[in-house]
């Protein structure tokens, strides 16, 4: 691969955690449709928590887990049935689409979607709508720049968590009392 190659990441969740009971994501046919669409625009890579379907083995990401965020940061898009990686892509300014039964129910992803337009969630029965939305972004030559603007807007609204924790630890135990005060100003950590 060269630095100029366009690539897309698919992330498939195992849905084996206790909170995943009766939850699910994309089926095999939907995954096939997704790959067929994305391959028209560049390379497709798959990362998965579960055993990869044999027909998708050739798409497996050939990287170590600790390299994932760097790989994600330079991708064109993430399509997933995983909440965590969808949010991570959003924070990196990478267009992300997720399709699972959690869509519309998780506050952080809802904020990233409704307030900032960084990620989009669809139920499995809305898969065709998701494909249409993905295609619109794929055809938008300014998508990367637009997502960078959205990302910067989101980051401007948030505090610097590292600065907060450094202050909190350096000033412990008084910092606990300050944070619990009704008039505590988190804005000073922007």
Report each predicted region and the residues it spans.
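Short internal beta-strands
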Residues: 45-48
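Nucleotide-activated sugar donor-binding and catalytic core shared by glycosyltransferases
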Residues: 1-41, 51-190
């Amino acid at each position: 691969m060269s630095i100029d190659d366009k690539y897309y990441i698919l992330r498939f969740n195992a849905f084996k955690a206790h909170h995943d009971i009766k939850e699910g994501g994309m089926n095999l046919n939907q995954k096939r449709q997704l790959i067929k669409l994305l391959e028209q625009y560049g390379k497709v890579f798959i990362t998965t928590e579960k055993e990869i379907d044999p027909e998708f083995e050739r798409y497996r990401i050939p990287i170590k887990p600790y390299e994932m965020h760097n790989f994600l940061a330079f991708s064109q898009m993430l399509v997933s049935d995983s909440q965590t990686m969808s949010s991570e892509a959003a924070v990196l300014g990478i267009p992300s689409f997720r399709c699972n039964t959690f869509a519309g129910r998780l506050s952080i992803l809802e904020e990233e979607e409704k307030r900032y337009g960084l990620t989009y969630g669809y139920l499995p029965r809305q898969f065709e709508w998701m494909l249409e939305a993905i295609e619109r972004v794929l055809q938008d030559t300014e998508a990367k720049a637009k997502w960078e603007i959205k990302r910067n807007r989101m980051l401007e609204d948030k505090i610097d968590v590292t600065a907060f924790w450094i202050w909190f630890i350096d000033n412990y135990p008084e910092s606990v009392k300050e944070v619990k005060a009704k008039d505590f100003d988190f804005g000073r950590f922007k």
